[in-house]
């Protein structure tokens, strides 16, 4: 299985995990100028932008640790573009950035992993 196919499998697992937790699916693999949003979900009235990370094991750090400051900035930018396409912004709607880290068979959901102020 190539890396793209494996990513799709883990994103689907993450989607199911979050849906079981009560979030509603909106979109997956949204590519925008400057970045990609793995999952866009809703938690009641809150837009939730989810970065899905997978690591086979934690020998080189867990999956959550791989969401660097640079990656956060790219996610913030992509989400801002996505919201703007819908006539919204971080100032006009509630949103948050979550990380769903999969390390081996362990799922770690980190709501509000970083702030919109970046």
UniProtKB/Swiss-Prot annotation:
SUPFAM superfamilies: Restriction endonuclease-like. NCBIfam families: PRK12497.1-3, YraN family protein. Coiled coil: none annotated. Pfam families: UPF0102 (PF02021). It comes from Pectobacterium carotovorum subsp. carotovorum (strain PC1). Gene3D superfamilies: 3.40.1350.10. HAMAP family: UPF0102 (MF_00048). InterPro entries: Restrct_endonuc-II-like, tRNA_endonuc-like_dom_sf, UPF0102_YraN-like. This is UPF0102 protein PC1_0307. Belongs to the UPF0102 family. PANTHER family: UPF0102 PROTEIN YRAN (PTHR34039:SF1). It comes from the Bacteria. One of its GO terms (molecular function) is nucleic acid binding.
């Amino acid at each position: 299985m190539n890396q793209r196919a494996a990513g799709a499998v883990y994103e689907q697992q993450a989607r199911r995990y979050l849906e079981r937790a009560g979030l509603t699916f909106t979109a997956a693999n949204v590519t925008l100028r400057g970045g990609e949003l793995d999952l866009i979900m809703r938690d009641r009235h809150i837009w939730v932008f989810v970065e899905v990370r997978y690591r086979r094991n934690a020998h080189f750090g867990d999956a959550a640790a791989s969401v660097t400051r640079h990656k956060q900035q790219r996610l913030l930018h992509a989400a801002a573009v996505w919201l703007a396409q819908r006539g919204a912004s971080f100032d006009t709607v509630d949103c948050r950035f979550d990380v769903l880290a999969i390390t081996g068979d362990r799922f770690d959901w980190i709501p509000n992993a970083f702030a919109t102020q970046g």
